[in-house]
Structure formats: structure tokens, C-alpha cells
Amino acid sequence: QANAGFTYSGNYLHAGPFRKLNLSADGYWNKVKDKIIAYPGGQQFRWTMLNLGTVDIKGVDASCDAFFSFGPVETAVKLQYTWQKAVDVTDPDDTFYKNQIPYVPKHSGSAVASIYYKGWGLNYSFIYTGERYSNKENTWRNYVLPWYTSDLSLQKTLNINKKTLKATAEINNLFGQDYEVVLNYPMPKTNFRLSVSIEL
């Protein structure tokens, strides 16, 4: 097993709109024996446990956090990206030797933008997952399309009698994207959620 990692972090403060910037990146390389994964079998709600033998995993995780302030308005932006190559190296004679393991994308990422003003919070999030395969062989029959989705939420926070009241309205899958996290299990189209919480 081999591991490599690096991290960079910055904490930049300024009197103008730009307040803070954090950057980080981590690289890794692992060889894992008897890696167990779960993936959906032929029947609905039934998952199969699979021992992959030996898996070679290389990857990079990177993130960026930025904070801005414009008078009473505060803004935060967070970006994340992952590249991961996880391949089965158990037996060179296997047809799936050095194929990407099931349901692990090579590319994935997210972006979140938030604006806060006098107890109000507006948040937008975008999630992307790249192409994957539903079984050990990386063939067109097992190909799973990339997917992405956007969510939007509005939150109001009130302090009443030393208690914190939070009301949130969410729009999930804002643009009605058709996508499947798991093959043949379509996710909901645009949907809504309202919630209220009280912190005593």
C-alpha cells in the first residue's frame, strides 16, 4: 500500500469585499485487498455484496472556499472536485482487469453559493457525477450516464424569547433533470419541501 498527500490552506483577510479564501488539495494512492462493495441486484430493493479482490485506487480531492462581505450582505462560495481512478487488478486474465469498479465515477464535483442578509439565507447548490458502470465490466451494457442536479433553498432565522426559529423552503432538482444515481432507478423530478425547526 502506498499513500501520498498534500494540503494547502490559506486564510486571507481584507478590509474590502473579499474576506477569506481557503484552498486545499489531497492526493492518494492505495492498493486495497478484499474490497467489499454493495450494488443493486436484479430485484428491487435487494443489494448484492461483492468482494472485488484487489483494487488499485488513485485520486485527487480539491476544494476552494471563498467568503465576501458587502456591508450587511455576506456571500460564501464553495467548490469541490474529485478525480478517482479505482480499478480491479485482481487477475490479469479477467475480462474486467483494470476496469473502473462499479458505481465509482472518475470525475465528480459540486458548487454551493450562499447569500445571507439580516436573518435571510439564499442557497444554490449544483452536484455533478460523471459516467460510471453498473457492473465489473466497463461495457456499453453496463454504462451509466453522468448526472447533475441543482437545488435552491431560502431560509429565515428568527430569535424569539431566547429561542431560534428557522423556516426553510426548498426546491430540489430545480430544472427537472432526468437522472439515475443507480441504473434503472430514476430520481424525482422537481420537488418541494417546507420545514420549520426550533432550537431551545
Cite the ranges covered by each PLM segment.
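Asparagine-centered polar/low-complexity signal
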Residues: 3, 50-51, 138, 173
